[in-house]
Structure formats: structure tokens, C-alpha cells
């Protein structure tokens, strides 16, 4: 028995115990060593006997027996002959499963180039030989000769010769040289390469060359050569002489009835290769004419190509039904390939699916499971119980009992199911809450019952949705399901940390109705001794639910010792609120209940319960809330009738007023006062405003009603109109929807997004006429089409995000960095968009937080900022905090818990082993379907409103100007002469309240540090033109301003004033091309004036289109405009919004017209212009001048002689994240991407924590480009993982060498996924062929660090509960190394202590769970 166990262990050991997977090129000897024999014939199986043919593709002698322990001829049967080889048929007697693992081979009569290394770009063979792919193909497909041995001739090695040239050369030199064609020639060339020498040569070339392109080319080739040297691959192995044959059971041939066969396409492809190979062998034996042999060799090459990757070269080989045959490459790539179909997504046994329906009486941790399903799913457990109880003697008997459905079976089912959690899953599973565990309750009927509160997490509704059930079988799985996946453990959303178990719809309506107030309700003013009495009064009809009464309320407050102190007060409240208080858990304040509860308030209730009282209380409270809500929703009798939609009386007059305005615009248009575009924009504006007014009138009408109070006076109260209540409570519907019911439908959009200018003035209550209905359908159909596209796009975005972030796991507690991001509240204009509290909650402080204006430490560094500490920050009005971030985390291959902060779904510091990458990807991807696909067209009307021209302050406070330069004009106002000036208003505590961007040339009435009062306008500017501001006072002197050459004079017809307009260089006559129109300022004597405190002349170069309204010699004062440059009013600008915008940001795509940023700090000047471009020069204080060519049509934001800082915007446009990273660093680019992504999500009202976006940004930044390599293993210009460089630099520092210099690089998520260290992960994502080719040539090793690789090789993932398992495996490896050195006896003793199995892993899990509980 012991031996048998040992034997079984030995069999299973081989596949389990590895830590690295290496991929490489197979040498011919290696292929032969795998093989169990050569396949010589193309036959498959005998069609009469169905036995495999000998030496054929299914040969039993090569691949193993067809039946278990039985040879082909039947001489040896049974287990006792195990391992015998039959002398008659040559088959080894063993299990038939060896037919899945034994390979064969084909000896090719002529070498064949492997198509992957030839055609997968860049071509590896081409790169190695330094030849173009076209030439190599000509040689391979027998069109040209190539010289392999030049000998003493003047031919060169690798030179191509045509047929004629070859014959000439043969005549001249006879046998001096050697030239061949076909794969043999390429093989000879590859064999003859001396890789080391070639590397040396390239290194020297790299030192000498200066041209960038050459360097790139050499580096590429050098990298490939070095990879070959290091990996031990030989270049000639890229040309195959032996072809491996896949085991037959992996390319099955199945006989169908009727004598036909269903076969895998691979068999056809192999047959083709064998046929051609055998024919070629025969031709070579016969010494056939060259041309025939060549043709056969070419056909062999083509058939091998088709087998490996059909359709990569030439037309794909098709089968009988004219569809291309599925080659080996097709087997592994794509959604149906091996990776995605079989390794990453498997079907699961013990599962079922059914329709879901509501289970309003369930507890949160329960679900209703139909008896029929349960019986089927829990079969093995029932069999075991029946046998152990003695009801059945054998499994067969038990099976019969279950099939007969005996009465006893149901009792046992109930017993088995007790406390055995099951998993429910609703597709699509967009985030981890899409699979949760519940305890099953057996029910009659055939639908699964689901608890209403988890619907939000599953995104489920009961209109026919289906859900799948899975049964966790092992004890470990049940434990995990209960401890980690139970619905009661998933109260908070991992995306933002808010409760996800929030009542909606009926429950909200019930609670809202219950907590409303009513003026002069029955029983108003009663005094009641406690909520029980209030309920009694309500039940007996003494008082209405909404009546205002006084009730004695007893609250419980936690004291220092953690016990509850009772506190009773007489409170003004309503009957309903008092009744609701009866379900409140101890420790909640009554103030939260004493209000009209809408959806937001209820969410806050549950959140408070969770934070104050912990998980268990919060869950029980949520359940009670739900039961109460349902009960009172039923009592309320809310329903919708057509009379509830009250149309405001004002509607008709608003509409007729709008129609008059439109008619007026139309007249103006016809008399030519406004353009067609302006007319269209104005009309749309008028209707939009009218619609708003109707909506407002309607809401005023609906939301209030007048009643008579107890004193007999009229009083307004919130209306009890059903439609209003539903919208107001947040149960269903919104003001916009009510507007369509009772106001007017308003403007509709065409499918292309533009707006139809005739609005629908009717609403749904009045009904639409045919035209109005038709207009409605127009835009509505587009909405439906969009939704379908959106779902696919959103899913693809999620897939890319998961792929890029999948290997990011919390691996240590603290990396010890002092770096971090500085968080400040997000303020746009005069209002705070996101308060500081939201940004830092759940983060860890990177530095001590000081009390503003003192040195007193409020919060020490490395403290997790929770709700209480955030209150401290608010109380002390701290307005910027430096917090740790994953982007600045120093951990290699992972992140640390401190840099991540709070686990949002649990509320404490995150545990080690948590897969934060996947959580981040799910949190960003899941709301993707809610984002729009729209591209927003902003027309003239909307953009006119967007162009501000002044700053009006909303708060009283102090003005602060950032990077501002200005001059003071004679009215002692400031005129800005700097570009990106920011103006902020701070309050008495120094907190920033408002934030504005102010353009060049703006006139400020208050300076830096001055006080302002609310409502004051402190800055003005002209939005349509940019002035050129004089910085000194003096007299104007025109230089190169020559009428007709460089400028033209224009006279305004209305005012009669004339002005000078500078011409664009392109429009000028030849004589004026090199002139530079300039305004110079001189003093009264005509001497040059210099700018204050500099030696720069006060002269202003005028760009094209500039308008000068001064005359030569005019006097100007400081701060006066010398000229104006019209800002082209940009027409309709498309703003990419929604999902495409998020995808663009994460893909780090460059926008069409990116902003141009200054590469260095210095003084701007302009050099010689070329045909379409201007030359911009920036001269720094010391060092090289930087120059850049800029297209003329780009509007520049700088004048000649102006000082710019590195990273300043020179020409407006969308900023490129790559530029931001290069010029302003990692923090700036993180901030940019986080803010831009958040803008899109905020617009849709989706809340996502910044952390998740930062996680993705970290993954986008994981590569670096080496700028100075010194004597390290890296090449300059090579792309390497940042972690690798850091590790090397640490070693170099220890050795006292200079560190390798590098620049961080930003990769889009697709690129980053493909550039990951793990080739398995990259291959299973996209471009499988390219990834595998690259990896094989380089002999890459996959350390199996990420989650995906481990799933693919079938291991526990190194995250969550598998984290401990992997750490232990690591420990054992170290122990094994020690053990190997010890003697045999000691080994046995130690091995007993260190055996880690999956069972141990589960023990570890239990340990971890206990730790987690303690932490909570």
C-alpha cells in the first residue's frame, strides 16, 4: 500500500513542482527526444476496422494504446502486463491517456524556415542576418540564390544572385564559392554567424555613430543578438529540420454514423506535410531535375507554414467547405483559443441557473433555492449521508432513492444544505460583487429568490433576469465563501467605500412616506410617553402617520468604557418617525431619524450604523429598514394617475413668448443682420431657456400645496402628490422625467448629436402629434444603438484594465518611502467641487500634518486618516495634506499596504495579499456602461456662455496670485503680463475657497494679499482679443510697419476710425517677407527704452492679424494695449466625452492638436521661418538653445523676448500626458490623468476613489528608458521595468558605482499589458503570435508573479488566501535547498515538518481569517 501511495505521488509530483516557465527555440535533437517515433505515412485510421494505421498519424506504436492496458492486436490485456511491449504490433501496454502526451516527429527531407520567426514583424531572421524580409523570402521560395561561402572570389557573403548571375559566377570561378537557395541557404548563413564577435562589432559601431535612426537600428539588432547569446538559443534552430507531431488525442478523429468522420483540421495539415515530404524524399532518391525538386521543396515550405500559421503568408489553405483550416497558431489565439477559452475561462460542475424573483421576507445572508435544483446540486452530499446513516448500502442504491425522491431524501437534503453556503452569480460579472455567497433556504417553485437589497450590487432586476448557482464543495471553499464572499460581508462598495446595500424604490418610498410631516394632521400636538404609545395611537386611529407630536425618545450613547448610557428627551417629531425609531439599534442618534428620509439620507443612516456599531448591527438594521419600508409603502397607497401630472398654467404664455422671440431672430436673419449659424444657436438658446422656465413653473406647482393649519391660517407644505413624492424621495423618476410628463418635452437631438431647432412643445399628458412623435423616435433610436455599442466598448475597456493591473498585489506592510501626492480640495471657479476630506479619507499621511501657522503636530506621519481624524483636519482648517500613494510606492513587484491605505470594502488598512490591481480595474470598468458614448458638440451659443470675461468673487477673503507678472497702470490697477496666472481667494483660516485662471492682459482691481468682499468683481478682460500690453510708458515708433508691404489700413464703416492690420507672412509681397513689423517704445528724444531692471529693449513684435489702433509717435502709458490680436472664435469644437475619453486617457493617446509645451526654461525668440512653419527658439541662462518648428496656423501664447518656464504652455491645445511626464514629472501626470478621468465619471454622478485610477497610472508608468547605462547589463535607449533598474542601482550603490540613469515612460494600457515581464500573461491578452515569438527568441523566463499566469498553469493565485500558500512555497524552496545538503535520516524528520499542501493552505486561510477578524 505504501509503495502504491509513493507511486501515485511520484506521478503527480512532476507537473506541480516548478517555479518558473521558460520558453525557447527547440533544437532538432530536443524535438527528437520528445518524440516516440517517426510518422512516415499520411494514413490515419482504417475505415473498416477503425484501428489506427501503423506509422500513420494515429499509430498506436508511436503514440500508445487505444484502449486502457490493451495492445492493438489484443495479445496482452489487463493490468498485470503493464509496461510490456507487444512483439506482434509493437504497442506498449499502458493507459490510453498517454495518447494525450506522447509526441511524434517528421524528419523533413529539406530544412524549412519557421514562419513565425520569418514573417512575424519585425522578422527575427531578417534582423539577425541584417537582410530585408523581401530578399529572404526570395531565397526561401526559390527565386534567387544567396552566397553562403564566398571563398577567394569577389562575391560577398549574403549577396543575392539571380539565375543568370549564378551561372555567370559558376563559369568564372567554378567551385571557389558556394551559393544556395531555399531554407538550407538561410540555415547555413545562420549557422555560420559568430554571435559574440557580431555583438562586439555592433557595440563599437554604437559608440561611433551619431545618427539617431542608426543608433535605434543597431540597438534593436544588438538586443536580439544578446538575447540569443544569453538564452543559449542557436540561430539555426529558427530553421526546422524536424517537425514535431501533436499527440493524437489533441487532434481527434471521430467516426460519425454513416461512415463519415469528424476530424480536427490539424490532421489535414499534417497529411499535406507528410505527403509532400515523402514525395520530396522520393524525388531526391531518383535524382530528379532541379526545377522539380525545387518546386517540391517550395511546396513543403508552404505546407509547413500553413500547419504552423495558416494564412500568415499567401492565401490560407481551405478545407472542403471553403473555410480556412485552423492551424496551430489559431488554436491558441483569440477568444476561442486555448488561453481564453480553456485556461482562463472554464465551465464549472455543480452549477445551475434559473430565473430570479423577489424574496422580501429573506434575511440579507439568505436566498431561496428551488428544491429541484438543490436536490441536483447537492447529490454527492446526499449519497454520502444516506450511506453513512444506513438508509442505502451502495452508491447505486442511494442514487435510486434520490431518483425516486423518497420522503427521507428531502429530510436529508434539508440537513445537508444547512449552513452550506452557495454562490450566486449574475452575468455580466463586472465587479467582484457580481458573485456573492448566501445560505440557501429550500422553497417550492422553480425560481431562485433573491434578497432585494443585494440587487444594486448584482445590478439585477426581476424582469426576467437569470442567475447561476455554484456549490463550493471543499471545506476550504465553504470557509472562504462564508468568511469573504457572504453578502453580509460585502456591505461597502470596493469602488468608493460607500454602502452598496442601500434600499431603493418601494422601500425608499415607504420610509419617505412614513417620515413626512403634515400640517394639521389628525392628533397634532399630542404628548406621548414613548414610541410604543405613538404606534398605538396610530393603530387605533387616534393620530395620523404624519401628524406633528411630542414624544419621549430614549437615545443610547457610547461612553469611554464602551457601554451605553441612556438619555431621554422630549422631542418634536411625527408619529411615523417615532415608529421608525423602534427599529433603530442602540448607539444611533435620533437626529438622523428625525427628518424626511430620502434615498441619500437612508444611505447615510446605514453608513453611520456601519461606522458606529460595526458590521453585524448594520446588517440587521438594513434588514429591518427593508421590512419596515415595504410595510409602509403598501400602507401609503401611492399610485400614479393622469391627474397627478399637473400642467402649469404659465406654460402657454412662456411658449408664445418664445415663439415671438424666434420670429424676431428669423427677421433679423432675413435682413442679413445675423448669420445662419448665429440664428440657429440663438433659436436653440431661446427654446432651452423656455423649457427651463416651464419646468420650473411645473415643479413649483407640483411640489407645494396650500393647506389650512390649526390656527385656521393658510400655510404651504410639501405636496403629497404621488409623482412628486416618488421623485423627491429618490425612489423613481427625476425632475427631467416629470418635465416630459407635465411640462414640455423640449429639444430633441438628431442621430448625429446635433439638435433639431423645432422643439416638442407638447408633453405626454397632452399627447404628441405625428410630427412630434416622429422627431422623438429620431433621437431615441440612436440611444438604443448606442447602448449596444457602449456595452461592448465598456467590456473591452475593463478587459484591458484588468490585464494591465492584474499582477499588482499588496506584498508588504510598509515600503518606508517619504514620497507622496499633495492633496488639495478641488475648486473650480467659485465652488468647491470635491472637499479635501473626500480626497484624503482612508489614505495614510506621508508627512507629519501640522496645525496651520504653528509647528504643532496634529497627526504624525504614517497614520491612516479615518473619519475622526478627518474631522480634526476640518476643525483645524488644514487645506493641503501630503498622503502616500501607490504611484510613489517603492515596493518592487507590488505595492505596500501603507501606500494604498484603507481597504474601501472593509474600512481598515488593507491586508497583505489583496489584489488591488484587479479591484481597481473592476471599479473603473464597472460603471463604464453608465458613461455616454456621446461626443459633445459645443456650438456657438453654448461656447459663448463658456467664454468668461471677468472674475466675480463669491466669498470674502484675501486675493492670492500664483506665477503672476504685472504692471500698474495710471488708474493704479494691475495689468497682467504673465500667461498662466492663477488667482485664488482664501478665507481667514488660509483655506482656499475659490480658484480662477486669469489670462494675459486682464485688468485686476485688487493685488496679491489684498482683501475683497463677496460679490466684488476683481478682474476684467476681453474674451475675443488678446492685447499686447505696454510695460513702460513712452512714445510709439513703428519699425517695418509699411503700408501695402507688411500691413493694410482698414476703416470701420460705423465709426469712421481707421486701424492698421498686420498681414500674415504668406499674404505679403516678396519684398515684405523678411520684414518684422514691430512697435518700439522710445522716450521723448527718440532714444530706446529698456524694460525695467533688464537690458531687454521695449519692443513688441506683431504677429499676423494683429490690429494696431495707435499712430506712429503716439504717447502710451504703462499697461495700455498697443495692439490687439483677435482670438479666432473657435467654431463647433468636439469635446470627446464619456467612455471614449476614458479609453483615450488610459491608452495615453496623443490628441490631434496637442498643446506645445516649453522643453526648457529661457527667453523666447523666433528664428528663420520655413514655408509652413515658424522656428521657435528658447535660450536658457546657460547651455544650449533649444529650437522647435511650429506650424504657422498654431496660435502662440508667447511674444518674443518673454521668459518661459519648463513645461509652460506655448500654444494652446489638449495636453499630451507624455509631455507632462517628461517636463513636469510623475506627480503632475498622475494628477492630470486622475483629474481628467474623474471629470468624466463625476459628470455622470459616479463616485470612484482616486486610488483606483492611481493604481492604473502606476502600471502605465512601470517602464523606463535607460538614458545612461555605464557598465550595467542595460543598453542605452532600452525599455526596462523600473523595478529592475532600481534593483540594479541598489547593487551598484553598494559597490560604489554611479547609478544607471533612466527616464520614466508612460505606456497606454494595451501597450503596458503587452510589455509586461510575464509572456504568458501578455500572450493570453492580445497579439499572441508576436508575444510568443519574441519570448521564444529571447528565451524568456516567466516567474509566475501575476494572477493570470498562475490561473493559466492551474495554481492558487498569489493573492488573497493563496498569498500565504505562495509565501510558504517560497519558504519551502529555501528549506529544500538546506535539506538537500543534510543526510537521508535527518531529511525524513524535517520533511514531516515542512509539507505544504492545499490542505495546509486552508489551515493558513483559517489563520488569516482570524487575523482579519482581530483587525476588525
Curated annotation (Swiss-Prot):
Residues given in the record as Mg(2+) binding sites: 461, 463, 465
Annotated GO CC locations: DNA-directed RNA polymerase complex
Catalytic activity, EC: 2.7.7.6
Sample GO molecular function, one term: DNA binding
Residues involved in Zn(2+) 1 binding: 71, 73, 86, 89
Claim: Transcription is one of the keywords in the record: yes
Entry-linked CDD domains: RNAP_beta'_C (cd02655), RNAP_beta'_N (cd01609)
Reactions this protein catalyses: RNA(n) + a ribonucleoside 5'-triphosphate = RNA(n+1) + diphosphate
Record Pfam families: RNA_pol_Rpb1_1 (PF04997), RNA_pol_Rpb1_2 (PF00623), RNA_pol_Rpb1_3 (PF04983), RNA_pol_Rpb1_4 (PF05000), RNA_pol_Rpb1_5 (PF04998)
Keywords, sorted A to Z: DNA-directed RNA polymerase, Magnesium, Metal-binding, Nucleotidyltransferase, Transcription, Transferase, Zinc
Alphabetical GO biological process terms: DNA-templated transcription
Cofactor binding note of this UniProt entry: Binds 1 Mg(2+) ion per subunit.
Catalytic class of the enzyme: transferase
The family this protein is said to belong to: Belongs to the RNA polymerase beta' chain family.
Record's subunit section: The RNAP catalytic core consists of 2 alpha, 1 beta, 1 beta' and 1 omega subunit. When a sigma factor is associated with the core the holoenzyme is formed, which can initiate transcription.
Protein's recorded name: DNA-directed RNA polymerase subunit beta'
Originating species: Haemophilus influenzae (strain PittGG)
Gene: rpoC
Amino acid at each position: 500500500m505504501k509503495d502504491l501511495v509513493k507511486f501515485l505521488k511520484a506521478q503527480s509530483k512532476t507537473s506541480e513542482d516548478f517555479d518558473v516557465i521558460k520558453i525557447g527555440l527547440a533544437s532538432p535533437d530536443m524535438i527528437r527526444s520528445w518524440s516516440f517515433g517517426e510518422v512516415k505515412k499520411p494514413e490515419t485510421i482504417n475505415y473498416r476496422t477503425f484501428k489506427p494505421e501503423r506509422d500513420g498519424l494515429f499509430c498506436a506504436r508511436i503514440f500508445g494504446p487505444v484502449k486502457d492496458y490493451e495492445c492493438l492486436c489484443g495479445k496482452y490485456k489487463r493490468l498485470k502486463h503493464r509496461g510490456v511491449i507487444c512483439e506482434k504490433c509493437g504497442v506498449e501496454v499502458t493507459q490510453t491517456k498517454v495518447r494525450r502526451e506522447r509526441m511524434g516527429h517528421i524528419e523533413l527531407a529539406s530544412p524549412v524556415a519557421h514562419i513565425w520567426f520569418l514573417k512575424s514583424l519585425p522578422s527575427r531572421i531578417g534582423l539577425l542576418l541584417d537582410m530585408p524580409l523581401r530578399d529572404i523570402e526570395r531565397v526561401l521560395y526559390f527565386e534567387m540564390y544567396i552566397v553562403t561561402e564566398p571563398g577567394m572570389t569577389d562575391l560577398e557573403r549574403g549577396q543575392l544572385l539571380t539565375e543568370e548571375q549564378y551561372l555567370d559566377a559558376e563559369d568564372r570561378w567554378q567551385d571557389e564559392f558556394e551559393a544556395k537557395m531555399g531554407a538550407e541557404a538561410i540555415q547555413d548563413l545562420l549557422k555560420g554567424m559568430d554571435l559574440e564577435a557580431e555583438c562586439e562589432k555592433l557595440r563599437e559601431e554604437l559608440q561611433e555613430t551619431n545618427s539617431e535612426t542608426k543608433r535605434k537600428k543597431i540597438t534593436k539588432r544588438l538586443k536580439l543578438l544578446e538575447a540569443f547569446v544569453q538564452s543559449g538559443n542557436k540561430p539555426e534552430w529558427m530553421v526546422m529540420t524536424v517537425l514535431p507531431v501533436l499527440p493524437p488525442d489533441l487532434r481527434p478523429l471521430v467516426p460519425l454514423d454513416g461512415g463519415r468522420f469528424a476530424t480536427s483540421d490539424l490532421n489535414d495539415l499534417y497529411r499535406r506535410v507528410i505527403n509532400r515530404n515523402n514525395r520530396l524524399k522520393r524525388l531526391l532518391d531518383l535524382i530528379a531535375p532541379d526545377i522539380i525538386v525545387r518546386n517540391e521543396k517550395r511546396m513543403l515550405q508552404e505546407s509547413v507554414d500553413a500547419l504552423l500559421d495558416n494564412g500568415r503568408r499567401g492565401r490560407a489553405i481551405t478545407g472542403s467547405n471553403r473555410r480556412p483550416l485552423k492551424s496551430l497558431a489559431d488554436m491558441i489565439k483569440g477568444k476561442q483559443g486555448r488561453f481564453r477559452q480553456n485556461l482562463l475561462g472554464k465551465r464549472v460542475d455543480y452549477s445551475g441557473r434559473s430565473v430570479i424573483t423577489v424574496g422580501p421576507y429573506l434575511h440579507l445572508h439568505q436566498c431561496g433555492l428551488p428544491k429541484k435544483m438543490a436536490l441536483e446540486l447537492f447529490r454527492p452530499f446526499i449519497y454520502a449521508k444516506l450511506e453513512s446513516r444506513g438508509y442505502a448500502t451502495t452508491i447505486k442504491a442511494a442514487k435510486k432513492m434520490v431518483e425516486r425522491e423518497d420522503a427521507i431524501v428531502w429530510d436529508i437534503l434539508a440537513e445537508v444544505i444547512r449552513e452550506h453556503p452557495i454562490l450566486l452569480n449574475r452575468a455580466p460579472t463586472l465587479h467582484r460583487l457580481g458573485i456573492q455567497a448566501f445560505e440557501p433556504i429550500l422553497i417550492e417553485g422553480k425560481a431562485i429568490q433573491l434578497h432585494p437589497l443585494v440587487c444594486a450590487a448584482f445590478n439585477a432586476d426581476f424582469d426576467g433576469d437569470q442567475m447561476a448557482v455554484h456549490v463550493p464543495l471543499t471545506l476550504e471553499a465553504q470557509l472562504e465563501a462564508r468568511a469573504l464572499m457572504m453578502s453580509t460581508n460585502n456591505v461597502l462598495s470596493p469602488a468608493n467605500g460607500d454602502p452598496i446595500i442601500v434600499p431603493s424604490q418601494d422601500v425608499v418610498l415607504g420610509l419617505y412616506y412614513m417620515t413626512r410631516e403634515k400640517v394639521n394632521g389628525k392628533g397634532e400636538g399630542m404628548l406621548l410617553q414613548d414610541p410604543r404609545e405613538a404606534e398605538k395611537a396610530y393603530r387605533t386611529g387616534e393620530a395620523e402617520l404624519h401628524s406633528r407630536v411630542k414624544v419621549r425618545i430614549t437615545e443610547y450613547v457610547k461612553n469611554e468604557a464602551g457601554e451605553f448610557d441612556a438619555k431621554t428627551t422630549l422631542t418634536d417629531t411625527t408619529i411615523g418617525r417615532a415608529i421608525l425609531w423602534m427599529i433603530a439599534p442602540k448607539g444611533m442618534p435620533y437626529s438622523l431619524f428625525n427628518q424626511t428620509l430620502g434615498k441619500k439620507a437612508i444611505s447615510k443612516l446605514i453608513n453611520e450604523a456601519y461606522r458606529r456599531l460595526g458590521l453585524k448591527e448594520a446588517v440587521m438594521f438594513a434588514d429591518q429598514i427593508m421590512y419596515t419600508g415595504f410595510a409602509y409603502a403598501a400602507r401609503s397607497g401611492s399610485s400614479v394617475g393622469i391627474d397627478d401630472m399637473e400642467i402649469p398654467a404659465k406654460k402657454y404664455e412662456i411658449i408664445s413668448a418664445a415663439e415671438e422671440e424666434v420670429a424676431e431672430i428669423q427677421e433679423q436673419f432675413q435682413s442679413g443682420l445675423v448669420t445662419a449659424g448665429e440664428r440657429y444657436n440663438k433659436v436653440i438658446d431661446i427654446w432651452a431657456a423656455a423649457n427651463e422656465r416651464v419646468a420650473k413653473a411645473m415643479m413649483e406647482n407640483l411640489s407645494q400645496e396650500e393647506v389650512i393649519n390649526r390656527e385656521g391660517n393658510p400655510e404651504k407644505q410639501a405636496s403629497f402628490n404621488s409623482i412628486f413624492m416618488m421623485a423627491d424621495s429618490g425612489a423613481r423618476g427625476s425632475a427631467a422625467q416629470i418635465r416630459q410628463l407635465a411640462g414640455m418635452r423640449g429639444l430633441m437631438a438628431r442621430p448625429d448629436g446635433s439638435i433639431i431647432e423645432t422643439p416638442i412643445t407638447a408633453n405626454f399628458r397632452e399627447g404628441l402629434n405625428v410630427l412630434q412623435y416622429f422627431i422623438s423616435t429620431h433621437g431615441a433610436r440612436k440611444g438604443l444603438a448606442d447602448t449596444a455599442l457602449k456595452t461592448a466598448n465598456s467590456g473591452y475597456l475593463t478587459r484591458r484594465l484588468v490585464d494591465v493591473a492584474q499582477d499588482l498585489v499588496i506584498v508588504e506592510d510598509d515600503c518606508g518611502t517619504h514620497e507622496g501626492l499633495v492633496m488639495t480640495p478641488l475648486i473650480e471657479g467659485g465652488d468647491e467641487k470635491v472637499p479635501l476630506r473626500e480626497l484624503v479619507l482612508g489614505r495614510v499621511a506621508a508627512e507629519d500634518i501640522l496645525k496651520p501657522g504653528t509647528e504643532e503636530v496634529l497627526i504624525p506621519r504614517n497614520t491612516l486618516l479615518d473619519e475622526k481624524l478627518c474631522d480634526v483636519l476640518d476643525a483645524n482648517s488644514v487645506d493641503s495634506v501630503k498622503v502616500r500613494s501607490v504611484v510613489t510606492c517603492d515596493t518592487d513587484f507590488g505595492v505596500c499596504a501603507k501606500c494604498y491605505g484603507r481597504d474601501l470594502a472593509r474600512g481598515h488598512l488593507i491586508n497583505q495579499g489583496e489584489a488591488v490591481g484587479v479591484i481597481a480595474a473592476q471599479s473603473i470598468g464597472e460603471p463604464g456602461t453608465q458613461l455616454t458614448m456621446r461626443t459633445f458638440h459645443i456650438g456657438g451659443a453654448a461656447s459663448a456662455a463658456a467664454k468668461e470675461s471677468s472674475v466675480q468673487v463669491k466669498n470674502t477673503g484675501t486675493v492670492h496670485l500664483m506665477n503672476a507678472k504685472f504692471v500698474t497702470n495710471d488708474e493704479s490697477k494691475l495689468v497682467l503680463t504673465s500667461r498662466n496666472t492663477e488667482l485664488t481667494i482664501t478665507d481667514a483660516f488660509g483655506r482656499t475657497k475659490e480658484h480662477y485662471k486669469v489670462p494675459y492682459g486682464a485688468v485686476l482691481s485688487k493685488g496679491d494679499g489684498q482683501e475683497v468682499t463677496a460679490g466684488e468683481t476683481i478682474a476684467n478682460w476681453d474674451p475675443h482679443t488678446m492685447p499686447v500690453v505696454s510695460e513702460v510708458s513712452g512714445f510709439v515708433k513703428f519699425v517695418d510697419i509699411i503700408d501695402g508691404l507688411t500691413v493694410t489700413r482698414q476703416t470701420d464703416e460705423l465709426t469712421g476710425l481707421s486701424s492698421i492690420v498686420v498681414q500674415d507672412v504668406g499674404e505679403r509681397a516678396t519684398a515684405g517677407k523678411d520684414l518684422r513689423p514691430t512697435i518700439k517704445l522710445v522716450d521723448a528724444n527718440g532714444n530706446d527704452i529698456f524694460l525695467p531692471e533688464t537690458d531687454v529693449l521695449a519692443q513688441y513684435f506683431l504677429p499676423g492679424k494683429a490690429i494696431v489702433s495707435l499712430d506712429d509717435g503716439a504717447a502710451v502709458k504703462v499697461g495700455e494695449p498697443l495692439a490687439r490680436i483677435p482670438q479666432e472664435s473657435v467654431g463647433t469644437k468636439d469635446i470627446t466625452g464619456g467612455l471614449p475619453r476614458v479609453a483615450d486617457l488610459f491608452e495615453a493617446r496623443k490628441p490631434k492638436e496637442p498643446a506645445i509645451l516649453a522643453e526648457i526654461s529661457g527667453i523666447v525668440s523666433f528664428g528663420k521661418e520655413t514655408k509652413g512653419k515658424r522656428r521657435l527658439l528658447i535660450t536658457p541662462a546657460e547651455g544650449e538653445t533649444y529650437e522647435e518648428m511650429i506650424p504657422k496656423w498654431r496660435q502662440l501664447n508667447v511674444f518674443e523676448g518673454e521668459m518661459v518656464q519648463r513645461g509652460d504652455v506655448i500654444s494652446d491645445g489638449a495636453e499630451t500626458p507624455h509631455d507632462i511626464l517628461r517636463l513636469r514629472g510623475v506627480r503632475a501626470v498622475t494628477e492630470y490623468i486622475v483629474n481628467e478621468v474623474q471629470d468624466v465619471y463625476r459628470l455622470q454622478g459616479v463616485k470612484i476613489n482616486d486610488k483606483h485610477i492611481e493604481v492604473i497610472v502606476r502600471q502605465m508608468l512601470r517602464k523606463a528608458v535607460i538614458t545612461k547605462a555605464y557598465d550595467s547589463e542595460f543598453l542605452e535607449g532600452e525599455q526596462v521595468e523600473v523595478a529592475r533598474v532600481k534593483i540594479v542601482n541598489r547593487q551598484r550603490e553598494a559597490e560604489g558605482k554611479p547609478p544607471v540613469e533612466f527616464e520614466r515612460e508612460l505606456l497606454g494600457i494595451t501597450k503596458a499589458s503587452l510589455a509586461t515581464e510575464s509572456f504568458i500573461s501578455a500572450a493570453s491578452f492580445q497579439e499572441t503570435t508576436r508575444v510568443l515569438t519574441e519570448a521564444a527568441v529571447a528565451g524568456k523566463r516567466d516567474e509566475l508573479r501575476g494572477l493570470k499566469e498562475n490561473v493559466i498553469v492551474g495554481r492558487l493565485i498569489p493573492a488573497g488566501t493563496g498569498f500565504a500558500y505562495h509565501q510558504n512555497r517560497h519558504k519551502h524552496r529555501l528549506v529544500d535547498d538546506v535539506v538537500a545538503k543534510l543526510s537521508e535520516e535527518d531529511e525524513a524528520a524535517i520533511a514531516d515538518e515542512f509539507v505544504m499542501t492545499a490542505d495546509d493552505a486552508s489551515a493558513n486561510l483559517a489563520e488569516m481569517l482570524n487575523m482579519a477578524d482581530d483587525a476588525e
